[in-house]
Amino acid sequence: MPKIVDHDRYRKELLTKSFDLFAEKGYATVTMRQIAQALGVSTGTLYHYFPSKEVVFEQLLEELTRLDILSISEQLKEEETLLGRIRGSFKLLETHREYFLKQALLIADFRQQQRRDGQESQVFQRIYDQVENLIPELFGIDDPTLTKFLMIYVDGLIWQDVYGCNCVDHQSQEDLICEMVTMYLEKHGLQQE
């Protein structure tokens, strides 16, 4: 009897397993052959699922985003208030700090390579739009300005780790953002859900 393969699940497994290789070597230097070797598959198998390294990487970013969304949704499902959801997000960010640092460095490497090659991938816009549309649902806010601010603030915290200064006290930043959001909501007559 022939082996039944769930191709979508297998493709996603290949993607998530490739993250560590990209994080270790960087986007620019990794080849399809190295990816195949690291995954323990033939280059033919890899090309069956992904026509190029760029496609592997773009689909990896989209899969990581999907998994991150599931993770944060799970983390926040019991939180009943906006401030509780913000604090839960900070807990997740702190717990997976190294992962988000690797992700930021990879994204920067990919963007640099794209710019060098005169290309412009749409993957970042798709991911940004997906996250921007999800935040109101996850956090219970319906304010585009606040949504963008929270996204920028979190990105800034991650980039502090990229700088390597180890000077960010996440607890004090969590307290500050909660205070700022509370004041913003009060000033604009918005409800904390």
Regions found by a protein language model. Give the residues of each.
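Amphipathic, non-transmembrane alpha-helical scaffold segments
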Residues: 11, 15, 61, 65, ...
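Amphipathic C-terminal alpha-helical segment
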Residues: 95-99, 113, 150-171, 183-191
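Amphipathic alpha-helical packing segments from all-alpha helical-bundle domains
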Residues: 114-148, 175-182
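Amphipathic alpha-helical segments used for helix-helix packing
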Residues: 94-118
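N-terminal intrinsically disordered/low-complexity leader segments
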Residues: 1-9, 189-193
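Short, charged helix-capping/linker segments at alpha-helix termini
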Residues: 5, 28-29, 140-144
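Helix-turn-helix
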Residues: 2, 13, 17, 21-55, ...
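Hydrophobic alpha-helical connector segments
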Residues: 59, 63, 72-99, 147-150, ...
